[in-house]
């Protein structure tokens, strides 16, 4: 009887070992849902070191609210549910000669969309973890615009145009070249420019000060109107 049990165990062990558990494969094609949404995202995968090609292999995800399907040529991890060769699932991705690992700093997370694109054709999102005051979230576009959010400030830059909102300093600033418009928490507004500053109204223009008002020019000052009233 004991010999029979041993034989059965050996047969079961042999069957389990013969079943595929996981492997690496290269994506041959990517399938997307149709207009009716009847089909799910899936890939045709050619297993490495094997002649097997699996069609329409479904994708797994760590969160049902996100999706990042691979591209043709990507190397993926394929696992077989319950060791069933007819039930493959793509469970992960592996960096390869087609897509190399990007450089990240310690404590930093980088998301590149799309992952296979070059630097001039992708969006980069960087997140830096840390204690309160040192966290950073940054989005960069290949054409130059950048948005950076820290615990204390928000900064947006497009070319020479820079907008900063500083929570600790209680100040918001928009600048370009030598021109700056600044607002602080006390209600003070400052406008400065290295060259000309022009204010033009299509209708009426009113300037009123509850306190003193000073107008000063190092050169010529000109007043022009159909009628000038001085009170």
For the regions a protein language model found, what residue spans apply to each?
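Hydrophobic packing positions characteristic
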Residues: 1-193
């Amino acid at each position: 009887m004991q010999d029979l049990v041993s034989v059965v165990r050996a047969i079961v062990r042999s069957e389990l070992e013969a079943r595929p558990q996981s492997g690496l494969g290269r994506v041959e094609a990517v399938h997307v849902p149709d207009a009716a949404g009847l089909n799910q995202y899936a890939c045709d995968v050619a297993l490495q070191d094997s002649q097997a090609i699996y069609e329409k292999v479904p994708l797994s995800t760590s969160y049902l609210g996100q999706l990042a399907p691979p591209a043709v040529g990507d190397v993926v991890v394929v696992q077989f549910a319950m060791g069933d060769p007819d039930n493959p699932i793509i469970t992960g991705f592996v960096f390869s000669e087609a897509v190399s690992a990007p450089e990240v700093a310690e404590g930093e997370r980088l998301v590149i969309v799309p992952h296979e694109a070059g630097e001039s054709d992708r969006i980069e999102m960087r997140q830096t973890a840390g204690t309160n005051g040192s966290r950073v979230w940054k989005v960069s576009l290949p054409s130059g615009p950048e948005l950076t959010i820290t615990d204390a400030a928000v900064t947006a830059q497009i070319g020479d145009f820079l907008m900063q909102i500083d929570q600790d300093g209680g100040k918001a600033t928009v600048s370009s070249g030598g021109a700056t418009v600044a607002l602080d928490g006390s209600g003070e507004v400052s406008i400065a420019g290295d060259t000309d500053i022009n204010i033009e109204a299509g209708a009426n223009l009113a300037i009123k000060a509850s306190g003193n008002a000073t107008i000063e020019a190092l050169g010529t000052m000109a007043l022009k109107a159909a009628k000038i009233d001085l009170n």
